[in-house]
Amino acid sequence: MKRRILITSALPYANGPIHLGHLVEYTQTDIWARYQRLRGHDCVYVCADDAHGTPIMLRAQSEGITPEELITRMHGDHLRDFTGFGIRFDLYHSTHSPENFEISQSIYRALRAADYINVREIEQAYDPVAGIFLPDRFIRGTCPRCGAADQYGDSCEVCGATYSPTDLINPVSAVSGAVPERRNSEHYFFQLGDFSDFLRRWIHSGTLQEEVAHKLDEWFSIGLSDWDISRDAPYFGIPIPDAPGKFFYVWLDALPGYMAATQHWCAAHGRNLADYWGPDSAAEIYHFIGKDIIYFHGLFWPAMLKGSGHRLPTGIFAHGHLTVNGAKMSKSRGTSITARQYLQHLNPEFLRYYIATKLNSHVEDIDLNLEDFLLRGNGDLVGKVVNLASRAAGFIHRSFAGRLAASLGKDQAFYDGLLQTQEAIGEAYAGREYGKAMRDIMALADQINAYVDQNAPWTLAKDPAQHESLHRVVTVTLNGFRVLITLLSPVLPELSRKALEFLQCELDWAGLSKPLLDHQILPYSHLLQRMEKTQVDALIQNPAESPATAPGTAAAPVPTPVPAEAREENPFIGIDDFSKVDLRIARIVAATNVDGADKLLHLTLDIGEGTRSVFAGIKSAYDPASLVGRLTVMVANLAPRKMRFGLSEGMVLAASGPEGGPFLLSPDSGAQPGMRVK
């Protein structure tokens, strides 16, 4: 059945560039939207710049331009970067729009009419030089707990303490440097606590991931406080109706920005806002967000919608944050990489794929390990997928004038087998289990490459008597390539576009059951260039010179390595260190000698969720045939390593010592492939 679906991503703030951390969310959302479109659903994906607030007002002042000029420029920059990464919005709007003014004020009026708004005086910090009330983050001073200087007005980045700006020692305005004054002002509050019973039920209704719902439960233990939804002039934002000099706090008008973008799109496409947001709408609405804003989307937003008579979202999907090389993105380490910096060096499809391999339906941080990124992108996309087309296309054009065979003959069953996991892969996409989908697709790529190796078209091409067999084999190979490209198309839109142009066919998920037969294709041209290490290295910006290497400073002497026997071993590691190693039970499904290698065996390991290719230095102790079917233990999250003989995707565990070895580790009976060793 065709579904009507509205999809949103969180609104990026119009005060800075898009960076790779942002792109986790927009890539996740875009993949999901593309998959829904691929399955024929009526899917609309909207987003917008979050374009109001004090930081935008102050930055515009510092640049000598108006806030409107700043947000117009940032909107263009953001949309350019999103487009560069293949993010396909149906509309990219702004919260500084007529629709958002109207909708935000309408929601407020409905909440006030229902007695969910109260007004009272509060005391605030005021900058007498700049003439503005200061948000907590615009006050700096000495932490009252640890004494660290130059800390924010609400929290210390050194010791993690939270406090009131009035607790800061020697506070100053970050805007003018003046000492803030304490002044009273009348503020408007949304009575969030009135919705406590409703929210307790709603967050466990299946709309949120269960771990998110449990996190939100913590707020009820201390009680839901009234939410301050007003700010005083001067302020760049939406005026509060019938309240001169008062403006909505940025989150009050950012959340309705989803509705405003929908309304703008509807007006251009003959639809009505009520088709999506009306209380009786049958449409599905899904918000993709980061884990840092679940409070606003899981409590404030549903309460605002409920109190103003609108329908609620169908699903809210939170994701984790991005780290680079195992650490938080950092300007000082050069790992705070913007989208624009990336696009200057590398094809965005590699990053889209890598993000997809890491994502699942849970709220887990993902790491961009640049060495793994290089090996996996080249190994999977170029080595396993694109090379299939380049290997087969030459034979088709040299021997068959670019025309595929009229039948798959005896290999029809092999092709049909490739489609057996198609629906499971589709279910993984739908469930946001992208990592599983990528593993299953790469397992298919391994099958097709094994088919090519077994049938050796380069050998068939030398024998005129095998002309028909050659035609069949390369036709099967190119149809297998089409399967891979179709399954990967939500993740790799540009590669799939080029590949389908080469194959002269349309993107058709359901049409894979009918292979391309007696079909003309174009001559092959490069679809995806390999990444070079120098390109990946160029992503890391040079950090500021450290004192040890600054001009005129002597470098510290390099310590002489200590032999392993003389090195004092640390007898302990923490449980956190051990838990980083993902040990899995694996079944050896194939074992072969490696040509040109004296010590290595090539193992294919079943780890439950797919297979891994591993090169192990155990040839001196084991006959390959004796290993097939045996269970062992592998390190499953070791970064892939490019070797002369191929890509090794993990490590099997073995013991050795003066008495001999290596001896493979084996689990007790009952263990199954994929089980984790804890």
Curated annotation (Swiss-Prot):
Key words of the record: Aminoacyl-tRNA synthetase, ATP-binding, Cytoplasm, Ligase, Metal-binding, Nucleotide-binding, Protein biosynthesis, RNA-binding, tRNA-binding, Zinc
Chain span(s) of sequence motif 'KMSKS' region: 328-332
Subcellular location: Cytoplasm
Organism: Acidithiobacillus ferrooxidans (strain ATCC 23270 / DSM 14882 / CIP 104768 / NCIMB 8455) (Ferrobacillus ferrooxidans (strain ATCC 23270))
Signal peptide limits: none
Cofactor detail note: Binds 1 zinc ion per subunit.
Keyword Metal-binding: yes
Gene: metG
Nucleotide-binding keyword on record: yes
GO MF assignments: ATP binding; metal ion binding; methionine-tRNA ligase activity; tRNA binding
Family as reported in the entry's similarity comment: Belongs to the class-I aminoacyl-tRNA synthetase family. MetG type 1 subfamily.
Binding site residues for Zn(2+): 143, 146, 156, 159
InterPro entries with a match to the protein in the record: aa-tRNA-synth_I_CS, Anticodon_Met, Met-tRNA-synth_bsu_C, Met-tRNA_ligase_1, Met-tRNA_synth, Methionyl/Leucyl_tRNA_Synth, MetRS_core, MetRS_Zn
Any matching Pfam family: tRNA-synt_1g
Binding site for ATP: 331
Name of the molecule in the record: Methionine--tRNA ligase
EC assignment: 6.1.1.10
Subunit organization: Homodimer.
EC class: ligase
Cofactor: Zn(2+)
Catalysed reaction equations from the record: tRNA(Met) + L-methionine + ATP = L-methionyl-tRNA(Met) + AMP + diphosphate
Ranges of residues in domain tRNA-binding: 577-678
BP terms from Gene Ontology: methionyl-tRNA aminoacylation
Assigned GO CC terms: cytosol
